[in-house]
Amino acid sequence: QFLSLAEAACADMDGEAPVIIEVPDDQASFPASGRHQTYENLLATGDPDFSWHMPEDEWESLSLNYTSGTTGRPKGVVCHHRGAYLMTMGTVVSWQMTLRPVFMAIVPLFHCNGWNHTWMMPLLGGTLVCCRDITASAIYNAIADENVGYFGGAPIVLNMLVNAKDNERRDFENVVEVFTAGAPPAPATLSKIEKLGFNVTQVYGLTETYGHVTECVWDDTRWGDANEDMRAAI
């Protein structure tokens, strides 16, 4: 989908450029170009008898992410195994997740490894639904067709769902749990999206360092009667 952009970026680099690995998708009309190695062919070159080098310490580096520059100049951030593990386990607890959930990946992997939700699915034996194009119709279709129960996204995603046209929407029976972060969602957006079948939890963290370490765990007995502005502020 972004092959031409990647090729142009590599051509504009000084020195040795990264190796491009294609992930073709015939169903989405993105066949292999034949100019680069494909992901499956790359895996086939691996040694099945290779002995893994497991980390000796939980503070060892796990991943290198590059931020999008939303809170400053783009920068590379290293995440350690301990941090990713704690974030993953914390989400499972706060979302009260059970075995075999269905999660839709909307947050990019370069944002704290997709808020570490990527590793949450193998832990629970769940299904990871990937959304190639972040549009209202694509999200509604995934929820209705794949029975998605969880996803995370910025308030712009919530606005997209609230303002979707009738022909972009789909009916679904389950309540979808949503984490939102990046900016405070508008009170009107929160009110409207709850009526559509989404239960939104506001979270806060730093893309540059860790993830959504602070969550607003809703207490309906204390705040259930609050008006829209107060609910949004909480």
Question: Where on the chain are the PLM-derived regions?
Answer:
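Short beta-strand->loop structural element characteristic of the AMP-binding/adenylate-forming
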Residues: 1-2, 7-8, 21, 75-78, ...
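Structural core segment of the AMP-binding/adenylate-forming
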Residues: 1-41, 147
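Hydrophobic/aromatic ligand-binding patch that stacks against planar heteroaromatic rings
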Residues: 9, 66, 120-122, 142, ...
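Conserved pre-ATP/AMP-binding loop-to-beta segment of ANL
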Residues: 21-22, 34-66, 73, 96-102, ...
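Gly/Ser/Thr-rich phosphate-binding loop
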Residues: 37-43, 123, 148-153, 162-234
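Conserved structural elements of the adenylate-forming
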Residues: 44-49, 58, 63, 77-98, ...
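Conserved S/T- and glycine-rich ATP-binding loop of Class I adenylate-forming
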Residues: 61, 67-70, 103, 109, ...
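Conserved AMP-binding/adenylation subdomain of ANL enzymes
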Residues: 85-102, 110-149, 164
